[in-house]
Amino acid sequence: MSLEPFAKSEALTFGVELELQLVNRHDYDLASASADLLRMLRGKETPGDIKPEITESMIEIATGICHSHDEALWQMREIRDRMVEAAVPLNIGICGGGTHPFQQWSQRTISASPRYQYISELYGYLAKQFTVFGQHVHLGCPSPDDALYLLHAMSRYVPHFIALAASSPFVQGVDTGFASARLNSVSAFPMSGRAPFVLTWDAFVAYFEKMRATGVIESMKDFYWDIRPKPEFGTIEVRVMDTPLTVERAAAVAAYIQALGRWLLLDRPFVPTEDDYLVYTFNRFQACRFGLVGEYVDPASGQRGALADHILETSKLLAPHAEALASEGALDMVREVVERRDSDAEWIRATEGETRNLHETVRRGCGRWAQVASLPA
């Protein structure tokens, strides 16, 4: 199909999507329970949307269009609470985190959706391995050219987003040494990575049509880029974050992206260039591997420093924009997370270190998501 026109949207409005883990309450392994949970939720009013994902052990929640951090947080809390209530009679737990710590990908079941079945046929075992859990943030753009400007300007800050949300240190029972191992699964797909460097919508449409003519892609859904335009919504979609362990952190990360977008749009502090991507892969790896204690190379100056320092320096620039957006509390939370090196990945590691039991770690993760002190063992 041809690329749809870029829809009109209100600049800097945003929406949040979270992919969540469904686990049984027996041993806290993943459970193929999305259809049952959706049945329990039928007829219950919630803001936003709840829908299945590529495998039956996943479920996705999405807010509606939000103007503020408080609005997004309220919506996510409402959806969370309805889901947690609906899961109780099913003996199912729900938790965040970018990977399930000990699930075996071969045991997963692909959802019945025709698109997911097609992906499974095309990509083989990669589709089941794609049982990983991410946060996506859509940001409204005033024009299609502004969308491409924001996409490439924000690419400098992809390591910020990765490190702030990193929550996937374990894969198949093994500590990977990564803060965000989830993105290694995404990188296996051929249309992943960063978007091509084009700064006008006409040039992007020409690129899309060339790719479509090859038969490699059919729609924007076939691109798994770190940030991609979503013309049907009039947004860009930031896709690099793990799903945090709480809706509070998810909302703070989304508000950080909104404030960053406002600064970039209003101040235009730099013009993106192809050379910005010279250190893109290095910076991305540092954030995935080391999280908030990683290094960061400034694409403009070439200066190498601490990623945490770069986030804190950026947060100072964003302060007036956070104030204008009424998200000062979210920016304060981001600063506190960085200053304390308080990542969700380290919480998972610390909990496993204390309990020596990944099943117990997942159980406590479910409690953290549900905002209760503990859940039945």
Swiss-Prot record:
Listed GO biological process terms: modified amino acid biosynthetic process
What is a single molecular function from GO for this protein? glutamate-cysteine ligase activity
Q: Spell out the Pfam families in the cross-references.
A: GCS2
Q: What is its EC number?
A: 6.3.2.2
Cross-referenced SUPFAM superfamilies: Glutamine synthetase/guanido kinase
Keyword Ligase found? yes
Q: Which reaction does it catalyse?
A: L-cysteine + L-glutamate + ATP = gamma-L-glutamyl-L-cysteine + ADP + phosphate + H(+)
Alphabetically list the UniProt keywords: ATP-binding, Ligase, Nucleotide-binding
Gene3D superfamilies referenced in this protein's UniProt entry, alphabetically: 3.30.590.20
Q: Which PANTHER family match?
A: GLUTAMATE--CYSTEINE LIGASE 2-RELATED
Family, as annotated: Belongs to the glutamate--cysteine ligase type 2 family. YbdK subfamily.
What does this protein's UniProt record list under function? Answer: ATP-dependent carboxylate-amine ligase which exhibits weak glutamate--cysteine ligase activity.
Query: Can you say what this protein is called?
Result: Putative glutamate--cysteine ligase 2
